[in-house]
């Protein structure tokens, strides 16, 4: 409610449920947050990349997002020629679904995650151990099919932007890289005064079949995250069954003004996607080795983060983040020229 009153964002039924429209004032807040995190990423040696909003179904079959994540995705986009051919053959919707599931028909998917695209960027070059870690960052918009009854303001939407990054490193670099990621999440939260947070270590359920990969790799990933979270010196809980299908994760959980928990920043260790995509680098022994992948997003979803910030500050943002920092009010029309000059001077000063 407050966000709409402040003219930060809007929703429109003709655009679609859960698809936020950022208005100019909201855009200022979003840009300031992006500039803030980008400055930190530059200091830590990240490279910014840009990727498409869609990818071939085959990409997500390799990653496992299709079909493991299928219920949370928008339906696939089928190529026009294939649709025309199916129509001429009198195919039914059930036939189309079967053809997509078996891979007989290729299609595209609105990306539910940025990681497969970043993997392909990493894999587009020959890599040596001297190049690692490679840190790729993107403000990437992703799409999830949230049920209409679950949608709410900016905190539960169908289109959202992550301050996403993926680190490709050697096994020996994992611990240090995790610490860097956790430090960044903590800096984001403390800078914005969000001190009421908890930490959750999300692990696999060994009795479930929803996870991919070698159990030994899972054990290594969980051990690395457990060691890292213990170094934070904050209380944390372990949550079996809450891991992503490809790896365990550390979630930073923030309380809103009425005490509800919301997951924001996250750090994940992943031995499985490098295996599924057959990633490699040349080690000091001149042999091929498998990198480890770390997923991290300090804000999590920019939409959710801004939604919680609006409540946290009750609309009274700190000056650097406020959509309107200065208002010049000439006390008489004869001072209008001076007011315009002052406004120009302030704008040029940033």
What kind of feature is each model-predicted range?
Residues 1-350:
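NTP/phosphate- and nucleic-acid-binding module
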